[in-house]
């Protein structure tokens, strides 16, 4: 019953914001129209809004889980139209906080001790509140300032109920929408379910932060807060408290004397290093999660502060290599290579003609190269390439789509800090240096050295394994020879059977013909009372039947 009321509310909100137009021609749209008389008249202001804005407003009204749904949907540019994706990026994940006393109970249950024994001070008024969790300031007994992230009470059940409802809606859309094969609604919901499941485990988020901190511990480009593991559990995450300026607060950055030009270049370098050196990148890098260190001593050498580690990205080694090669091919305007890489990577089927892909890549990239370099977006070029490649049955892993969205965010932050930022000039040497290091003989030797214990462990078994493999090959060949002989014998048997069947059919036919000729008494030669042709036909037919019987 609860699910029914929730579904009715969703339908009501969809009609209020004219989202039935997104379901044109489907059974779902017809059902929604039946409910129109029970929905207040749609205001002219809403009607005039774009479909993307109407969807964004509807998701905000439906509540925090649907806001999160919209945010995740905005990262899947391969599944949603560009105008809708651009609007969903603006969704704000801000909701009313829950009671501080409730937060204390959750913390005590998760950590197995009282708040007083865990913290010298705990502020029950949250610093920030979002759909999944909220953050409180606290001080440890050793006087270190920390922030405590606490999951919302009963959030797992709320998400489970809404996901179940979304799955039902996705199934309905898949069976009724004419473009369901392009929208792939069930794939979208599955992606949302996976992402939300990861965000519900704060211990996992702590592990992400810890790994990222280890990669950048000695860096002047970005700082990752320390995880306080003694105060962290599945529903509670405690981190070192950071003070900084949001990267989109340009006025405050200027007032603090921060070198924005140096900062913007660092952002691009950090991203490419995370992707191609560490293979572990912050995949939710919008301005709210990327701050700038406000330490006055860092005005001329500023650094970023990373926050919120719920969504991290990793690529397979194969995708990592082909993506890097794609970037280099774009830098060199080598459209043939771009086309070849898409096929070699398995993103596009082998049967697609390289020449067609090359022409498509040229049509995408050339218009961008007529602009000044400072106005070229590598993320936009990549997104357009993938969009065009969808015509050729493009298949991409979700992590690649996540990277594309992150690159778009990073470039946006960089251009906000420095509108004249030349991403190509900054990114190219970083990428070339990382690729040279990654595929150098030294790196190969390092990888070999890393795997040496494993190699040495299995080395004594190698001769036996080789001998076993050779024996299997010989046995397999013998077995194949036996099978071949059996097949040949069977083929000969079938050929003989075929000949006997033919002889039997011919013999029967000739005997029938002999009988008919005998009965008709045709003109011509006779041997006694028997027509010669009847006699010949009968003899040949009898011989053919005897041949078929004798061979059997």
Curated annotation (Swiss-Prot):
It is an enzyme of class 2 (transferase). Pathway: Cofactor biosynthesis; ubiquinone biosynthesis [regulation]. Belongs to the ABC1 family. UbiB subfamily. The active site is at 284 (proton acceptor). Residues 121-504 form the Protein kinase domain. Its EC number is 2.7.-.-. GO terms for molecular function: ATP binding; protein kinase activity. The chain crosses the membrane at residues 501-521, 530-550. The gene is ubiB. It is a multi-pass membrane protein. The keyword Protein biosynthesis does not apply. It is found in: Cell inner membrane. One of its GO terms (cellular component) is plasma membrane. It comes from Xylella fastidiosa (strain M12). This is Probable protein kinase UbiB. HAMAP family: UbiB (MF_00414). The lineage of its organism: Bacteria, Pseudomonadati, Pseudomonadota, Gammaproteobacteria, Lysobacterales.
């Amino acid at each position: 019953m609860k699910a029914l009321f929730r579904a009715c509310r969703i339908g009501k909100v969809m009609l209020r914001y004219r989202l039935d137009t997104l379901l044109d021609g489907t059974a779902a749209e017809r059902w929604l129209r039946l409910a129109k008389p029970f929905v207040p008249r749609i205001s002219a202001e809403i009607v005039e809004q774009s479909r993307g804005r109407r969807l964004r407003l509807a998701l905000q009204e439906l509540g925090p889980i649907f806001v999160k749904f919209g945010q995740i949907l905005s990262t899947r540019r391969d599944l949603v139209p560009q105008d809708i994706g651009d609007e969903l990026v603006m969704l704000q994940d801000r909701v009313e906080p829950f009671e501080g006393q409730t937060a204390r109970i959750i913390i005590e249950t998760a950590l197995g001790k009282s708040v007083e024994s865990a913290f010298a001070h705990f502020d029950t008024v949250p610093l920030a509140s979002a759909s999944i969790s909220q953050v409180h300031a606290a001080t440890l007994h050793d006087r270190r300032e920390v922030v405590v992230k606490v999951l919302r009470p009963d959030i797992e059940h709320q998400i489970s109920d809404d996901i179940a409802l979304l799955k039902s809606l996705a199934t309905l859309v898949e069976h009724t929408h004419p473009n369901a094969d392009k929208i792939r609604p069930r794939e979208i919901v599955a992606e949302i379910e996976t992402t939300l499941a990861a965000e519900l485990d704060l211990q996992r988020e702590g592990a992400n932060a810890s790994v990222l901190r280890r990669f950048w511990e000695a860096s002047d480009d970005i700082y990752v807060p320390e995880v306080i593991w003694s105060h962290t559990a599945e529903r509670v995450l405690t981190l070192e408290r950071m003070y900084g300026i949001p990267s989109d607060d340009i006025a405050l950055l200027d007032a603090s004397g921060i070198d924005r030009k140096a900062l913007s270049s660092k952002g691009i370098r950090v991203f490419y290093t995370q992707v191609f050196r560490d293979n572990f990148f912050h995949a939710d890098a919008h301005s709210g999660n990327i701050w700038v260190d406000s330490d006055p001593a860092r005005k001329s050498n500023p650094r970023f502060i990373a926050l919120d580690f719920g969504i991290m990205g990793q690529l397979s080694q194969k995708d990592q290599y082909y993506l890097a090669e794609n970037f280099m091919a774009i830098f060199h305007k080598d459209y043939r290579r771009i086309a070849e890489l898409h096929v070699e990577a398995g993103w596009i089927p082998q049967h697609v003609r390289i020449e067609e892909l090359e022409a498509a890549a040229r049509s995408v990239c050339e218009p961008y190269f007529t602009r000044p370099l400072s106005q070229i977006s590598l993320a936009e070029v990549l997104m357009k390439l993938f969009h065009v490649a969808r015509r050729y049955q493009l298949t991409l892993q979700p992590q690649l789509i996540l990277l594309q969205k992150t690159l778009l965010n990073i470039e946006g932050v960089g251009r906000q800090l420095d509108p004249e930022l030349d991403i190509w000039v900054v990114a190219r040497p970083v990428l070339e240096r990382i690729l040279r290091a990654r595929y150098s003989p030294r790196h190969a030797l390092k990888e070999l050295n890393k795997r040496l214990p494993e190699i040495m462990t299995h080395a004594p078994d190698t001769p036996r394994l080789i001998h076993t493999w050779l024996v299997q090959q010989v046995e397999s060949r013998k077995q194949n020879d036996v099978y071949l002989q059996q097949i040949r014998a069977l083929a000969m048997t079938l050929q003989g059977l075929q000949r006997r069947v033919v002889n039997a059919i011919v013999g029967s036919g000739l005997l029938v013909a002999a009988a008919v000729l005998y009965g008709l008494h045709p003109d011509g030669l006779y041997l006694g009372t028997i027509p010669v042709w009847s006699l010949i036909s009968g003899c040949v037919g009898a011989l053919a039947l005897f041949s078929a019987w004798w061979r059997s």
